[in-house]
């Protein structure tokens, strides 16, 4: 299983930026579109309290929104 999950919707511009950010840095990730996966949508609300996307999970850490500083910190912690 991928260490990085990016929860998205098809119309989310910040989700596209997050995916591009990981691709540019050659960080493998798995995209989970919550429009097609209602269980994943419920999971992010349960874990983060937020219904919006992007939500990024790196290892066991959840990041709400496209926050480069938090993403870089977690990627460094995981040596990705």
Residue spans for each PLM region:
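C-terminal basic regulatory modules in eukaryotic proteins
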Residues: 69-80
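A short, hydrophobic beta-strand/beta-hairpin element that forms part of a small beta-sheet core
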Residues: 54-63
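Local sequence-structure signature of Cys/Sec-based thiol-disulfide redox active-site neighborhoods
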Residues: 1-25
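Thiol-based oxidoreductase modules, predominantly thioredoxin-like and allied folds used
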Residues: 27-40
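Major-groove DNA-recognition helix of helix-turn-helix-type DNA-binding domains
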Residues: 46-49
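Residues that scaffold the ATP/ADP-binding catalytic core of kinase and kinase-like folds
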Residues: 15, 66, 74
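Nucleotide phosphate-binding site architecture
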Residues: 13, 35, 72
